[in-house]
């Protein structure tokens, strides 16, 4: 699913954030961490609605230092946070 910048803008995604998303990540889910629960993140944003049905997807935080409000790129193969965009 291509990066849906318009949907992300509603969540506060700016031009600087968009520049941080690498070309090879533009087909992945990019979103904002809305909630943290014991090693899991609830992410809302581009592509999350298609995967989670309600506009959010729950993924593992394994190896990622995430906080609520962070922009993240998800790894679709194993449903985890692949990368946290710079804060």
Show where each model-derived region lies.
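N-terminal accessory targeting/assembly segments
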Residues: 1-87
């Amino acid at each position: 699913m291509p990066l849906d910048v318009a949907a992300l803008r509603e969540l506060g995604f700016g031009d600087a954030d968009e520049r941080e998303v690498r070309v090879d990540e533009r087909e992945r889910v990019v979103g904002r961490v809305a909630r943290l629960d014991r090693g899991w993140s609830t992410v809302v944003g581009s592509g999350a609605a298609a995967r989670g049905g309600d506009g959010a997807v729950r993924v593992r935080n394994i190896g990622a230092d995430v906080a609520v409000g962070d922009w993240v790129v998800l790894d679709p193969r194993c449903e985890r946070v692949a990368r946290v965009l710079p804060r």
